[in-house]
UniProtKB/Swiss-Prot annotation:
This is Sec-independent protein translocase protein TatB. It comes from Alkalilimnicola ehrlichii (strain ATCC BAA-1101 / DSM 17681 / MLHE-1). GO terms for cellular component: TAT protein transport complex. The keyword Cell division does not apply. The Tat system comprises two distinct complexes: a TatABC complex, containing multiple copies of TatA, TatB and TatC subunits, and a separate TatA complex, containing only TatA subunits. Substrates initially bind to the TatABC complex, which probably triggers association of the separate TatA complex to form the active translocon. It is a single-pass membrane protein. Keywords: Cell inner membrane, Cell membrane, Membrane, Protein transport, Translocation, Transmembrane, Transmembrane helix, Transport. It comes from the Bacteria. Its main location: membrane. GO terms for biological process: protein transport by the Tat complex.
Length: 179
């Protein structure tokens, strides 16, 4: 602390002994030791306080750095969330538009077909299967419909019969009619 070597301390002791004398010298050394101890304690307290302040300042800097990083990430997340919401709204709008168009087309087909010709709208076939042209007529090769309600000749194409069998098996229905 004071950077005093052995020789410096010895010279100070000799001068103190000459000035104070041997009786007062012991008391002066004791008091000097007490003051030196108090000075060291005060110095160490100040040193530790400065170190704590530096640590607090470092923590503040680290906290501020983390806060900036968190703010940056939060802004990125909010930006991506807004973009995602915009895309989701666009997809939802597209699906709503397609649904409206399908509803309009179904209403248009129902009103265009009239109430008497329900079979042309697909209502006559209980299976819901119709030809692509919109009629209940069997395919050009002859054979039965998927429900098998017409009773046409059994000389249907083998592929048609296997399809009928597969459909009946999936529907959980009864046994297939054989003619």
């Amino acid at each position: 602390m004071f950077d005093l070597g052995f020789w410096e301390v010895l010279i100070i002791m000799l001068i103190g002994l000459l000035i104070l004398g041997p009786e007062r010298m012991a008391r002066a050394v004791r008091m000097a030791g007490l003051y030196m101890g108090k000075a060291r304690a005060a110095f160490n307290a100040a040193k530790s306080e400065v170190e704590r302040e530096l640590q607090v300042e470092e923590m503040r800097k680290a906290t501020e750095s983390v806060r900036k990083d968190v703010d940056k990430v939060r802004k990125d997340v909010e930006k991506n969330a807004r973009r995602f919401e915009a895309e989701a709204d666009g997809v939802g709008k597209t699906f709503r538009d397609v649904g409206r168009q399908a509803d309009d087309a179904a209403k248009g087909a129902a009103s265009g077909a009239g109430g008497d010709d329900a079979r042309s709208a697909g209502a006559g076939d209980p299976s819901g299967l119709t030809d692509q042209r919109g009629s209940d007529q069997p395919p050009a090769g002859g054979g039965r419909t998927a429900a098998g309600e017409r009773g046409e000749p059994a000389e249907a194409a083998p592929a048609q019969q296997s399809e009928d069998t597969a459909r009946k098996g999936q529907g959980g229905g009864g046994e297939e009619k054989r003619q």
